[in-house]
Amino acid sequence: MRHVSYKLKIAIKDAAGLGSISIFRWVEEHLSFRAFYSLLRPIFLVRAALNNAFKKTRPAPALPDFLRTPRTIKTRILQRTDIYLNSVIENFPDRLAAPKWMANCRIEGLAHLQEAQRNGRPVVLAYCHVGPFYVAHFWLRTMGFPVVSLVGGKSAKRTRLARLQDRFCPLPEMPVTLYLDQLRELARFLAAGNLLYMAIDTPTGKQMVVPFCDGWDFQMATGAIRYAIRYQAELIPCSITDEGSWHYRITLGRPVPREHLTAEADWSCAGKHLLGEMLPLFQAHPDQCWDAMTRNLIRKDNHGENR
């Protein structure tokens, strides 16, 4: 009985999701960019307010100076509103190449990707769960870069709704997401000189502690480094910034030097390079990285040891 109830719940969720996809795609097609945004923002603002109405304000944890900005109910509501708005793009990534969307995302550091492609090297794009990270690969694919994201879990767990959304992704001939039980597919994908989009701030898998800023370390997953070594790929830090009103900036930092990408190397050097490239963006937009930083930062005591 429980199994039947679970399947019914999933079916209802998929049906609701399919309905929302159809609605968003219809509205996007028939409204101008400005009208579409103006329609959705007040709706999502109310939804975010209701979502935060009964949540208590938690005491602020100890954090580096650049993250010590007040976390009021208002800031949480606005942040949640932006998440809802940015998630809408997942319903029509195939339309991001249209004139009304294409100018909304600019890429800095594009030369790093282009050089890797000229040299026939695959690329691992290392990112943190900062800003609208969940739409960066859509924009990259829209611009013609064959990128797939790697996530934990098993491929059988990918929902019917997610598979439906995959059909709308640019470059539909290749997968949108690969899982840890699809390493053969991943090997073939990277051997063809493609791009892998992979998080470095997940709590699963092998971990290491990397110096971050004065008095603080960062707990980092080593998967991106290990895959870059295994497949002789360039390891490039990748961040996306929400600049408001569905405008974005993707920043590609300098690739990690090859001497840091060997099995014998001190991998913390690669980790420090990645974080060093990302830190200026974190400092410029603390509101977009607060959640990720509170999960991964480790404070040192006066003797330089981790607490």
How would you describe each model-predicted region?
Residues 103-107, 129-130, 176-180, 217-218, ...:
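A conditional alpha-helix N-cap/helix-loop micro-motif detector
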Residues 2-127, 162-163:
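Membrane-anchoring hydrophobic helices of lipid-metabolizing enzymes
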Residues 61-63, 139, 164, 227, ...:
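Residues within well-ordered alpha helices
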Residues 76, 119-178, 207:
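Catalytic core of membrane glycerolipid acyltransferases/transacylases, capturing the structured
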Residues 118, 142, 146-148, 180-307:
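Non-catalytic C-terminal accessory region of glycerolipid acyltransferases
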Residues 11, 100, 123-124, 173, ...:
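Short, contiguous strand/loop micro-motifs
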